[in-house]
Curated annotation (Swiss-Prot):
The chain crosses the membrane at residues 7-29. This is ATP synthase subunit b. F-type ATPases have 2 components, F(1) - the catalytic core - and F(0) - the membrane proton channel. F(1) has five subunits: alpha(3), beta(3), gamma(1), delta(1), epsilon(1). F(0) has three main subunits: a(1), b(2) and c(10-14). The alpha and beta chains form an alternating ring which encloses part of the gamma chain. F(1) is attached to F(0) by a central stalk formed by the gamma and epsilon chains, while a peripheral stalk is formed by the delta and b chains. InterPro entries: ATP_synth_B-like_membr_sf, ATP_synth_b/b'su_bac/chlpt, ATP_synth_F0_bsu_bac, ATP_synthase_B_chain. It is a single-pass membrane protein. Keywords: ATP synthesis, Cell inner membrane, Cell membrane, CF(0), Hydrogen ion transport, Ion transport, Membrane, Transmembrane, Transmembrane helix, Transport. F(1)F(0) ATP synthase produces ATP from ADP in the presence of a proton or sodium gradient. F-type ATPases consist of two structural domains, F(1) containing the extramembraneous catalytic core and F(0) containing the membrane proton channel, linked together by a central stalk and a peripheral stalk. During catalysis, ATP synthesis in the catalytic domain of F(1) is coupled via a rotary mechanism of the central stalk subunits to proton translocation. Component of the F(0) channel, it forms part of the peripheral stalk, linking F(1) to F(0). Pfam families: ATP-synt_B (PF00430).
Amino acid sequence: MSINATLLGQAISFLLFVWFCMKFVWPPLMNAIEERQKKIADGLADAGRAAKDLELAQVKATEQLKDAKATANEIIEQANKRKAQIVDEAKVEADTERAKIIAQGHAEIENERNRVKEDLRKQVAILAIAGAEKILERSIDEAAHSDIVNKLVAEL
């Protein structure tokens, strides 16, 4: 193989091509590659942070859900206690009202019985006087008559 001018020209052309590529083509390519690597690294870092944030959010959501359930159970328990209290108060009030109505009924019955007794005494006194008048055929004067009636009413 002989070295001739063509080979020397090709070598010089190749060196100029390499120098041109190193000067003008290689730096933008390297910048693009480095920029792409940086974007990928940033994306991976963001993904890692997002995964941690998601995990923290899930833990926080779970805690809030537990707190909400506990609060709901507490509210339900308080409502049940209040319901029982209202029912007990209603029972006490109903018993009080029942006792009041019964006492009022007994008082009314007693009053009616006393009134009926008094009416009956008066009627018996009137009948007794009428019977006595028929027997005595009006031999007793009016003053004695009133005195006898009053005594009969007092006895009855």
